[in-house]
């Protein structure tokens, strides 16, 4: 009895409430998976019904997790004590409601903005070529802008990882960035 009380006092309840406007998710099973050695272990699941899903459980520690549909990772988030709200649409995914998820998705928003600027830079290069600008002028301008964006991205990532070295976000985001995991982009498009 004492050991049961000791276990429950260390455990924390989490509750996930999600909504999705992506119609192809209706009727699908979503799984919460956490790293376990060299594989991902499913710890919870729910069916998406009319764009809504709910999960709840007990975790013994705060950990990085991913929401999966079949074998496809849709998004990262943090399993921690509290109510976690997940919103999925065709353009983006947002997780809020708990301190670390709020912090993670603030970072995701900033990173997405930089990614959008990098995409626009590629379009700008194409427009410059179509406008007949000199190739060396295009190269200089685009290279300068790419280097500026890369420096901003590196500064953003470095600051985030340093500020979160003492929790699961620092190492979790570091690993995701090093493995080119697409953070924040909807990967469940129709």
Predicted regions, residues:
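A non-transmembrane, solvent-exposed segment enriched in polar/low-complexity residues
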Residues: 10-154
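Residue-level detector of conserved catalytic or cofactor/ligand-binding positions
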Residues: 183-190
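Amphipathic alpha-helical repeat scaffolds of TPR domains
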Residues: 166-176
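Sec-dependent bacterial lipoprotein signal peptides
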Residues: 1-8
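N-terminal alpha-helical segment
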Residues: 153, 169-170, 185
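Short coil/turn linking the two alpha-helices of tandem helical-hairpin repeats
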Residues: 178-181
């Amino acid at each position: 009895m004492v050991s049961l009380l000791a276990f429950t006092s260390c455990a924390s309840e989490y509750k996930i409430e999600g909504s999705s406007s992506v119609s192809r998710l209706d009727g699908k099973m979503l799984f919460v998976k956490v790293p376990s050695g060299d594989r991902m272990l499913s710890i919870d699941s729910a069916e998406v019904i009319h764009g809504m899903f709910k999960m709840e459980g007990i975790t013994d520690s705060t950990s990085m997790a991913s929401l999966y549909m079949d074998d496809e990772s849709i998004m990262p988030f943090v399993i921690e004590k509290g109510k976690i709200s997940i919103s999925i649409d065709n353009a983006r995914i947002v997780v809020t409601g708990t301190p670390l998820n709020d912090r993670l998705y603030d970072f995701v928003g900033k990173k997405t903005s930089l990614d959008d600027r990098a995409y626009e830079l590629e379009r700008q290069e194409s427009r410059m070529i179509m406008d007949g600008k000199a190739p060396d002028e295009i190269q200089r301008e685009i290279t300068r802008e790419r280097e500026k964006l890369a420096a901003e991205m590196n500064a953003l990532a470095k600051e985030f990882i340093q500020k979160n070295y003492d929790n699961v976000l620092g190492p979790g985001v570091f690993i995701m960035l090093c493995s080119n995991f697409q953070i924040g982009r909807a990967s469940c498009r129709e």
